[in-house]
Amino acid sequence: MCNNRYTLDGKIHDAQRLRELQKLPLDNKILIAQARLIEWYKYWNGQCYVGLSGGKDSSVCADIAAQVCELLGYKLVLWFADTGLEYPEVRRNVDDIYNYLKQKYNIEIELVKDYPKDRKGNRITFRQVLDKYGYPLISKDVSNTIAGARRSIAKGEDSYRLRKLKGTLKQKNGQPSKFTCAKWSFLLDAPFAISSNCCDIMKKRPAHKFEKERRLVSIVATMANESYLRLSTWFKFGCNAFNEASPQSRPMSFWTEDDVLEYIKLNDIPLASVYGEILKDEDGGYYTSGVGRTGCMFCLYGIQYEKEPNRFQQMKLTHPKLYDYCIRECDKGGLGIGRVLDFINIPYGKDDMKIERNNI
């Protein structure tokens, strides 16, 4: 088995190496991503699939995987999780990407469209997840910490998560832990449930079920700079995580959003219209005139870091009906996200919001 603690040139994965890789020109990054996918496909004898969301990152990953499949003579399997949380334009782009790849490459391509189901095979909706578990808020780590701390309080017990939230968590040497999140302790008093279960139920469980049924391993387009969890995973496994419980290839881990946009521009990859146009700023960097990132429309993770107009303010302009459903109270048939945003003091549709370059 490959030793994925090291890069192709024998260097260990650390912060310095990641910075070096991120500074490489796009052509070099494409070659490295191809090399990692060749390594992955060969190791698993072609029994792999690409997670395709219809967004810009996964579309690029699918195109590079198609190149590798054509080189090695393998079938390209694309898997789309139809969670009901995608922008309509992104959902439609899944078929556009499939048709684009069919025309461009001389390989067999299979597109599988799946959705989250309960044990009886009934579709699970986002509203059901919110009602049963709570809202995904701030980050997966913070949501998980809040949920665990609340359980500890209900039992009258101390716990790792409660100490983490109160800021009293210590390292082995007695020093304060860097993993505390006391900043968000006020969320313990929020008048709504908070949970990190959403992604697991809506995406990960269907993916694992598909992997088990088809005996395939996954390829995804996540990047190390997107979160601390993804960064630490790259430090541990590199791009190809052979030794994870669920093996996964992340061939674009060292890429940046600028790389993705440049690749799409150069290769004329189909792009969902919600992104708008790909443009260059004064420094030569790429950006989109529409939304910057798509993902799940109603997700609250990272909202605290967004400049105005944030994702919900943009949604009000671009998708007013979906915005109304999102913000409206639960007892009036909505998702109740408005009151959640009010609680953490995040604007979501005020008339005086600032209009910036990425506004549609």
What is the role of each PLM region?
Residues 2-259:
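ATP-dependent adenylation/nucleotidyltransferase module used to activate substrates
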Residues 2-19, 46, 244-245, 256-360:
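ATP/NTP-dependent adenylation/nucleotidyl-transfer catalytic domains that generate, transfer
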